[in-house]
Amino acid sequence: LVRVIQGSVIDVAVDIRKESVTYGQHFSIKLSEENKKMFWIPPGFAHGFASLENNTIFTYKCTEIYNKESERVLLWNDADLNINWGVEKPLVSEKDMNAICFQHFTSAF
């Protein structure tokens, strides 16, 4: 469960459940301190976000303890996923720049 308490983001969930009819499809939503929306990312979905404002504060509520070793990263600008992040010149982390494309992703779900 994610929520923005300051600023705003575009938040994205990608279905990575191999047997799902919506496998590879994504849903995006704007979360902001003004709209106070929360977004549930269920198991079997990849999660990403792009901050739309400086000094954005983003909170997470997790169902399990965070396990960095299990984290895998999809390429943020993957052509197959075709996600509109709503930003023209994003600042992208090295980890996200070196992620794998969806076509080569092997899902654990």
Label every PLM stretch briefly:
Residues L1-E34, L52-F109:
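Active-site region of the double-stranded beta-helix
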Residues S32-F49:
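Conserved SET/PR-domain catalytic core that frames the SAM/AdoMet-binding pocket
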